[in-house]
């Protein structure tokens, strides 16, 4: 995304590796990206993601900022982070209960190794996809009431 009206903070650059300068030079207009994303999301019957509620809030805020309706709010969705707390059983720092697993932690639990390029959008999508299908295959998750409801 090309920054328009904001600057990418250095802390964010350290996480995902995209500097403000790189985004200015190589980024795409956010309206174009949102239009493509919303068309794809509109053609799907289920949104799947890791920490999906965060992503839906960020995209929803951008939709509203651009003058669009936030139709993602009511879209059926499945979060691999929220649904695998008991599966991963990673102790919470407070000592009570379990914490939400990071995508890398879930991936390691399922496949015994890390995936590369953490915080790279394409790598995160691929890892989430792989985790979702492995969890479904194992019967660990049931994203809908019936597998017949899945569109794939």
Language-model regions: role of each:
Residues 1-66, 71-73, 101-113, 119:
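Conserved non-catalytic scaffold segment of RNase H-like nuclease domains
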Residues 63-67, 84, 88-91, 110-115, ...:
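Short, well-ordered alpha-helical segments in soluble proteins
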Residues 106-110, 122, 126-152:
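Acidic two-metal-ion nuclease catalytic site recognized across multiple nuclease folds
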Residues 96, 117-122:
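Active-site metal-coordination segments of metallo-dependent hydrolases
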């Amino acid at each position: 995304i090309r920054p328009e009206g904001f600057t990418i903070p250095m802390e964010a650059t350290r996480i995902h590796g995209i500097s403000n300068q790189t985004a200015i030079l190589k980024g795409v207009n956010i309206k174009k990206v949102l239009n493509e994303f919303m068309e794809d999301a509109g053609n799907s019957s289920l949104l799947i993601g890791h920490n999906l509620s965060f992503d839906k809030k960020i995209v929803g805020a951008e939709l509203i900022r651009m003058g669009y309706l936030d139709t993602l709010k009511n879209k059926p969705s499945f979060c691999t982070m929220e649904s695998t707390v008991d599966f991963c059983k990673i102790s919470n720092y407070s000592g009570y209960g379990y914490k939400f697993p990071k995508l890398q932690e879930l991936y390691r639990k399922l496949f015994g190794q890390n995936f590369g390029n953490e915080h790279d959008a394409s790598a995160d999508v691929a890892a989430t996809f792989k985790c979702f299908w492995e969890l479904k295959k194992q019967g660990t998750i049931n994203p809908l009431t019936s597998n017949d409801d899945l569109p794939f």
